[in-house]
Amino acid sequence: MKKRKLATFYMAIAIVLVFIINVALGGGNRFWIFLTGGGYVKDYGEASFKLVLEQGQWWRFLTCGYLHMGVFHLVGNMAALEMIGTRVERKLGPVKMLVIYNLGTMLTAFLWCLVFPEGWTIGASLGIFVLLGMLCVMLFSKGGKGLTELSRYERGYLVFYVIAGCFLGIGTIVGHLIGFVIGILVGFAIIKMHLQGRTG
């Protein structure tokens, strides 16, 4: 395994371990927690307007990005993280990728809670869509030629990943859209700084 992929790999391992711990600790029928979510860890890690903005449990803006509603939610997000995260890590390095993912997750969760004050949110897609938006800017900044960096399978899966999220409710759609827009803005900012560095 190449060093440039280690941050994405270890972050995925951490997310999977959180899922396993959540299932093991229970908080309900473990089989259904495995399939559809729930559990003690989810209850202590999800983000909502009331828990974070009213009760001051700010860590939830970060922990919510490491929790999932069942194994299918987990697998879908980890496949996307591997494809997107590794490429962002190659372009920016492991530290910047991790910072952008985690801060992006927190900002996306914060804005989501403002839009849906009665709801709660979890899922790595909060940060993944930030990385996706940023990666799209970087790839299209090459006149579209950057898309060749993705295999046909990867392009197909990412299209499926985006479309599938649209069938999971308005909350998911809004969360993905917020993250994607944040990622686009970050991508343009990085390109601008890169250009200034070359001309400065």
Regions found by a protein language model. Name each.
Residues 1-200:
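A detector for small-residue-rich transmembrane helices and their helix-helix packing motifs
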